[in-house]
């Protein structure tokens, strides 16, 4: 698979305009990226812009801190799906991961995943690895799998750092099933993206997709 097919072309700035979202969608179609990832308020716009193409629409749930209560995350997910989202990146309750509250974490993931899967959509669970040690990452991997999420994702882009090679290796150490991995946060170059793919990532989240593709052309 070519690099472009791994990229979730991302625009999550709170100041992003509708014109910028439409440009994001045009770029995604031109470069044949896997998806566009936009804020919930822009899902319907993006869905209309890429309708009839292979580009999927992704949005975020409980973003960026994961501190929404489960009922709100479920409502967010339902609205995004109704607006045309095919993929949802949900921030887990990081405080509950750190506290080891398995039932709370697994139940929340499972509830959002069930809504997604009922509509033929996928869910990626963001665990914000910058805030976790290895023990917490192992716990998060277990919860993500138990909740039947499709992906585990490193980062929101709002913490002190994005995903690292060490994070990916840690995921691979503790994931036991078919859960896929998405790397994100600070991925700005072609070499970085390719390295994460070599490590086993199935998706790359980046707002620098065009620059990464143009790097090849130059």
UniProtKB/Swiss-Prot annotation:
Q: Which domain of life is it from?
A: Bacteria
The active-site annotation reads 89 (proton donor/acceptor), 153 (schiff-base intermediate with acetaldehyde), 182 (proton donor/acceptor)
Disulfide bridge positions per record: none
Question: For this UniProt entry, which residues form the secretion signal?
Answer: none
Under the heading SUPFAM superfamilies, the entry gives: Aldolase (SSF51569)
Q: Where in the cell is it found?
A: Cytoplasm
**InterPro entries from the xrefs?**
Aldolase_TIM, DeoC, DeoC/FbaB/LacD_aldolase, DeoC_typeI
**Matching SMART domains:** DeoC
Which Pfam family, just one, is annotated for this protein?
DeoC
Q: Name one GO cellular component term.
A: cytoplasm
Q: What EC number is given for this enzyme? A: 4.1.2.4
Q: Name one GO molecular function term.
A: deoxyribose-phosphate aldolase activity
- UniProtKB keywords: Cytoplasm, Lyase, Schiff base
Please name the pathway: Carbohydrate degradation; 2-deoxy-D-ribose 1-phosphate degradation; D-glyceraldehyde 3-phosphate and acetaldehyde from 2-deoxy-alpha-D-ribose 1-phosphate: step 2/2
Q: Which reaction does it catalyse?
A: 2-deoxy-D-ribose 5-phosphate = D-glyceraldehyde 3-phosphate + acetaldehyde
Its top-level enzyme class, in one word, is lyase
Q: What's an example GO BP annotation here?
A: 2-deoxyribose 1-phosphate catabolic process
Please give the NCBIfam families that the UniProt record associates with this protein.
Answer: deoC
Query: What function is annotated for this protein?
Result: Catalyzes a reversible aldol reaction between acetaldehyde and D-glyceraldehyde 3-phosphate to generate 2-deoxy-D-ribose 5-phosphate.
Please report which protein family the annotation says this sequence is part of.
Belongs to the DeoC/FbaB aldolase family. DeoC type 1 subfamily.
Its name, as the record gives it, is: Deoxyribose-phosphate aldolase
This protein's species is: Treponema pallidum (strain Nichols)
The organism's lineage? Bacteria, Pseudomonadati, Spirochaetota, Spirochaetia, Spirochaetales
């Amino acid at each position: 698979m070519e690099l472009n097919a791994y990229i979730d072309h991302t625009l999550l700035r709170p100041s992003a305009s509708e014109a910028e979202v439409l440009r994001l969608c045009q770029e995604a179609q031109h470069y044949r990226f896997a998806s566009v990832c936009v804020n919930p308020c822009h899902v319907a716009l993006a869905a209309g812009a890429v309708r009839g193409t292979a580009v999927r629409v992704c949005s975020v749930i409980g973003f960026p801190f994961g501190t929404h209560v489960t009922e709100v995350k479920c409502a967010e997910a339902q609205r995004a799906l109704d607006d045309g989202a095919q993929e949802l990146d949900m921030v887990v309750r990081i405080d509950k991961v750190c506290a080891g509250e398995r039932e709370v974490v697994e139940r929340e993931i499972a509830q959002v995943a069930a809504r997604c899967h009922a509509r033929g959509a996928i869910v990626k669970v963001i665990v914000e690895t910058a805030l976790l040690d290895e023990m917490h990452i192992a716990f998060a991997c277990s919860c993500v799998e138990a909740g039947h999420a499709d992906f585990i994702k490193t980062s929101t882009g709002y913490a002190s750092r994005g995903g690292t090679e060490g994070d990916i290796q840690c995921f691979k150490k503790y994931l036991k099933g078919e859960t896929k991995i998405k790397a994100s946060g600070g991925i700005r170059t072609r070499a970085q993206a390719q390295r994460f793919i070599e490590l086993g990532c199935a998706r790359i989240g980046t707002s620098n997709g065009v620059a990464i593709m143009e790097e090849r052309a130059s």
